[in-house]
C-alpha cells in the first residue's frame, strides 16, 4: 500500500468486506475546505443514503417474495401455510410496508435526479426504510421459522443486509430527530 496508509480488513455483520483505514503522516492533497468541503460531504451523505434506500427496497422485495413463496409451498397440518388467513394478512402488511418504503425511496431518487440534494427528503426516505426493513425482516424470519436464520437459506442474508443498512449513516432515531429538528412552524404540526 501507500506510505503511511494502514488497512485492516474485516467482515461486516452482513458478511460483506470492510476495512479500517489508518492514515499516519500519509501524503495528501486538499480537495476542498470550509463551506465547500462541508457541502461536498453533505451531498455525498445524501447520495449514499438515497442509494442505500434503493438497495433496501430491493432486499425487502426479495425477502417478501421468498416469504410468500415459502407460505405457498410449506405444509403444516396437511395444508400449505398460505391457507392460514393470519399469515396471509401479515404478508399483506409486509407488502404495504414495502410500497411505503419504495414510494419514499423513489421520491428521494427523483429529487436527486432533478438536481436537488435535500437532506430532509433523504431522512424521510431513510426513516421509512428503517421502519419497513425492521418489520419486514422480523416477519420474514418469523414466518420462515428456524430455516430463515440458517446460512443456507437466503432470507436471513437479506435481513442481515437490511439490518446493516438500517444502521448506516444514521438509524431511525437519528433520522426522526433530524426531521423533528427541521420543523420551523409548530402550529402546522398536528398531534393526536
Please provide the spans of the model-predicted regions.
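Conserved catalytic-core motifs characterized by acidic clusters
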Residues: 31-45, 71-84, 142, 157
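A glycine-biased, small/acidic residue-tolerant capping/turn segment at secondary-structure junctions
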Residues: 110, 133-159
